[in-house]
Amino acid sequence: MKVDLDWVHHKLQEVVNHAYTPFSKFKVACMLVANNQAFYGVNIENASYPVTLCAERSAIANMVTSIGKATIDYVFVYFDTKTPTNSPCGMCRQNIFEFATDKTQLFCIEKDKSFKQFTIPEILKGGFRSYEQ
């Protein structure tokens, strides 16, 4: 599948407006592709900080709610900030790992359209699974 990063960037710029970030103002949007379907998520902050939900986990919850367990082919994470070199937090990396394969592609996309591309094993060495995939 050829990835149209311009389209993804444009779509996630729209989706990120739904992020609820009254505390940090650090808006993030995520799009997962699984079974040739797109699933979206945004970060949702809470006054009780540990309750905050990251965009990646929000998108995974959307996917599982919509179609059940599926294998993620692509993860696109958009950071609406001027801070360069963003990437998913450790908790999100482990959560993505649960639904990914070694071939799953992760794109970290910045506001200025610059991006970094990774495979899941590159960003999470020794991820934990309680079952064989």
Curated annotation (Swiss-Prot):
Cofactor(s) needed, names only, are: Zn(2+)
| SUPFAM superfamilies tied to this protein | Cytidine deaminase-like
Q: Main EC class of this protein?
A: hydrolase
A GO molecular function term, named singly, is:
identical protein binding
Which keywords belong to this entry? Hydrolase, Metal-binding, Zinc
Location of the CMP/dCMP-type deaminase domain: 3-131
Its UniProt entry gives the catalysed reaction(s) as:
cytidine + H2O + H(+) = uridine + NH4(+); 2'-deoxycytidine + H2O + H(+) = 2'-deoxyuridine + NH4(+)
Which residue positions are annotated as catalytic? Answer: 56
Question: What positions does the entry give for substrate binding?
Answer: 43-45
The protein's matches in Gene3D superfamilies, at most eight in alphabetical order, are given as: Cytidine Deaminase, domain 2
Any binding details for the cofactor? Answer: Binds 1 zinc ion.
* Record: residues binding Zn(2+): 54, 89, 92
**GO CC annotations?**
cytosol
Biological processes, Gene Ontology terms: cytidine deamination
Question: Does the keyword Glycosyltransferase feature in the UniProt annotation?
Answer: no
Quote the InterPro entries the UniProt record gives.
Answer: APOBEC/CMP_deaminase_Zn-bd, CMP_dCMP_dom, Cyt/Deoxycyt_deaminase, Cyt_deam_tetra, Cytidine_deaminase-like
Q: Which family does it belong to?
A: Belongs to the cytidine and deoxycytidylate deaminase family.
PANTHER family linked: CYTIDINE DEAMINASE
Q: Which NCBIfam families match?
A: cyt_deam_tetra, PRK05578.1
The UniProt subunit note reads as follows: Homodimer.
Role description: This enzyme scavenges exogenous and endogenous cytidine and 2'-deoxycytidine for UMP synthesis.
Q: What is this protein called?
A: Cytidine deaminase
Origin organism is Mycoplasma pneumoniae (strain ATCC 29342 / M129 / Subtype 1)
Organism lineage reads as: Bacteria, Bacillati, Mycoplasmatota, Mycoplasmoidales, Mycoplasmoidaceae
